[in-house]
């Protein structure tokens, strides 16, 4: 499993129980244990690869915890996203690029919420904006692999480049 630097805020059992009451559901025990250990936190450089045509991979930047600073506080993030993500889901961590990883409070399913989908369609339905990532938190955590972005660039080389002819003309005219 990937290393996660725990939050400096300590897990608060009472605040966690109050949050569950607000949700009207008990969160999975494995999620509570994760919060007791890390209470959110920041993972090392990582990648989660998906078997999806639209989104191939993502990186987790921050996990949310109980009574953390507002930007990484579970309750605060839930209030921010509750109308945007599918119902019966809570945001558990932030992914690179503004997307959110969600935990379904009924079945423990982990999904990636793609914020771009709500910008593309006026008839947007939050239920259509998620991609399944894992069947449980434990499975999700096992999918997070260490990844060094700098080393990864060494593996790629440019094979072909296309420049819009109109853009090229504009660049040349700016030089003159």
Describe each model-derived feature in a short phrase.
Residues 113-145:
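Compact, glycine/acidic-enriched structural inserts
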Residues 141, 147-149, 159:
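Gly/serine-rich nucleotide phosphate-binding loop at the start of the catalytic core
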Residues 93, 111-113:
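Residues in well-ordered beta-strands of folded domains
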Residues 104-107:
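Short acidic-glycine loop/turn motifs at beta-strand connectors
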Residues 56, 98-101, 117-124:
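Short, surface-exposed beta-strand/loop "edge" segments at domain boundaries and coil↔beta transitions
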Residues 1-100, 151-160, 165-176:
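A surface-exposed partner-binding patch
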